Swiss-Prot record:
Gene Ontology terms: biological process: negative regulation of cilium assembly; negative regulation of protein localization to cilium; protein transport; small GTPase-mediated signal transduction; vesicle-mediated transport
GO cellular component: cytosol; Golgi apparatus; membrane
Modified residues (Phosphoserine): S130, S382
Subunit comment: Interacts with RHOH. Interacts with the GDP-bound inactive forms of RAB3A, RAB3B, RAB3C, RAB5A, RAB5B, RAB5C, RAB8A, RAB8B, RAB10, RAB12, RAB35, and RAB43; binds RAB3D to a lesser extent. Interacts with DZIP1; this interaction negatively regulates the interaction of GDI2 with GDP-bound RAB8A.
Membrane topology: Peripheral membrane protein
Modification N-acetylmethionine, positions: M1
Protein name from the UniProt record: Rab GDP dissociation inhibitor beta
Compartment(s) of residence: Cytoplasm; Membrane; Golgi apparatus, trans-Golgi network
Originating gene: GDI2
Highest taxon in the source lineage: Eukaryota
One Pfam family recorded for the sequence: GDI
Native source species: Canis lupus familiaris
Gene Ontology molecular functions: GTPase activator activity; Rab GDP-dissociation inhibitor activity
Keywords in alphabetical order: Acetylation, Cytoplasm, Golgi apparatus, GTPase activation, Membrane, Phosphoprotein
Positions bearing N6-succinyllysine: K57
Length: 445
């Protein structure tokens, strides 16, 4: 370990593992350490079930009705992958897909007036849906056609709208969309957590709706994918990539000190030895004095013995509870997966509820979601701080990831990865460039 590295990475969360993989593919000498004996950090999948009981300090062993402990892989952070999103592109370009198997999530649902409705995934479903009335459907369809034809590079598709200036709220007005349709569009399709986006230029929202519909078009049932054996497989896949390119991995390594000289990182001390480095990447838990809290997320892992009611017995789904429906500022999400994904014992379902906490009693805030899941066999409640770095890290060369937010997909995580990459290298993250580098090493195959 007493060596010189270009980059040392602390923590094996998804953000850290992807950056570690990218850096090694770029020819950097990388040492990657984690104080835990397992991969994944905050975004780990916990197995066996007994370990989750211990982690959440639930007394006693899981009851026999839970089946074999080894059959469980429980994600601490619930997220799906958008089928056409940035993370899938990163997986494809780096060929990490060869280590993973994905399943399409069976449906996406939205909560309205105390009931859940399927988010239409085909035109026929849209016409038959009772989410909106007939005239609303026509106006909504016009809006979706506009979005589908919209091209940032072709002003003829703008129809008098300035994508960089016109607020999306104005665009909704132009198409005469009602409040329910606006809620549905912003929260179930563009996947915004709050209504703060309404005053922002419309370009971002249009691109988000495009991402949703392109992701949906790939597989048809829903725009979401989920890896067999749980999300913990993702960081491990990128760790393998890093190892192939000569990255060094050490788990179960207590980190004693990050050594800084004249305001700049020069190394990391572990078990009395010092590894030197030019740059450091880490998650907030390794540098508590360099991050600040900007909020909290509540997540509740619920074990069920039944599919969620009114989901057509889906073995996996997402439910979005728009904030307006429950008088909140942020949406509440439910991600549900099951034994079909090799993450639970036969006949069992895992539903994870999450949202940004807004009061001192976050458990009360998520009651509408828990009511949809009844009866719940066992629940595990976690409230975690949302932490962000206090500075960009360009002076100290210590680059800190943000904690995982309450969104149910990895787009914001990928934004963070690209942002850190730019701060570290001074250049934009380029998927194509990465692909070329891989071909140089492997040759064209």
């Amino acid at each position: 370990m007493n060596e010189e590295y270009d980059v040392i990475v602390l923590g094996t969360g998804l953000t850290e593992c992807i950056l570690s993989g990218i850096m090694t593919v770029n020819g950097k000498k990388v040492l990657h350490m984690d104080r835990n004996p397992y991969y994944g950090g905050e975004s780990a999948s916990i197995t066996p079930l007994e370990d989750l009981y211990k982690r959440f300090k639930i007394p006693g062993a899981p009851p026999a009705s839970m089946g074999r402990g080894r059959d469980w892989n429980l994600d601490l952070i619930p997220k799906f992958l958008m089928a056409n999103g940035q993370l899938v592109k990163m997986l494809l370009y780096t060929e990490v897909t060869r280590y993973l198997d994905f399943k399409v999530t069976e449906g996406s649902f939205v909560y309205k007036g105390g009931k859940i409705y399927k988010v239409p995934s085909t035109e026929a479903e849209a016409l038959a849906s009772s989410l909106m009335g007939l005239f609303e459907k026509r106006r909504f369809r016009k809006f979706l056609v506009y979005v589908a034809n919209f091209d940032e590079k072709d002003p003829r598709t703008f129809e008098g709208i300035d994508p960089k200036k016109t607020a999306i709220g104005e665009v909704y007005k132009k198409f005469d969309l009602g409040q329910d349709v606006i809620d549905f569009t912003g929260h179930a399709l563009a996947l915004y957590r709050t209504d703060d986006y309404l005053d922002q230029p419309c370009c971002e929202t249009i691109n988000r709706i495009k991402l949703y519909s392109e992701s949906l078009a790939r597989y048809g049932k829903s725009p979401y994918l989920y890896p067999l054996y749980g999300l913990g497989e993702l960081p491990q896949g990128f760790a393998r990539l890093s190892a192939i390119y000569g990255g060094t991995y050490m788990l179960n390594k207590p980190i004693e000190e990050i050594i800084v000289q004249n305001g700049k990182v020069i190394g990391v001390k572990s078990e009395g030895e010092v590894a030197r480095c030019k740059q450091l990447i880490c998650d907030p838990s390794y540098v508590k004095d360099r991050v600040e809290k900007v909020g909290q997320v509540i997540r509740v892992i619920c074990i069920l013995s039944h599919p969620i009611k009114n989901t057509n017995d889906a073995n996996s789904c997402q439910i979005i509870i728009p904030q307006n429906q429950v008088n909140r500022k942020s949406d509440i999400y439910v991600c549900m997966i099951s034994s079909a994904h090799n993450v639970a014992a036969q006949g069992k379902y895992i539903a994870i509820v999450s949202t940004t906490a807004e009061t001192k009693e976050p458990e009360k805030e998520i009651r509408p979601a828990l009511e949809l899941l009844e009866p719940i066999e066992q629940k595990f409640v976690s409230i975690s701080d949302l932490l962000v770095p206090k500075d960009l890290g360009t002076e100290s060369q210590i680059f800190i990831s943000r904690t995982y937010d309450a969104t149910t997909h990895f787009e914001t995580t990928c934004d963070d990865i690209k942002n850190i990459y730019k701060r570290m290298t001074g250049s934009e993250f380029d998927f194509e460039e990465m692909k070329r580098k891989k071909n140089d090493i492997y040759g064209e195959d």
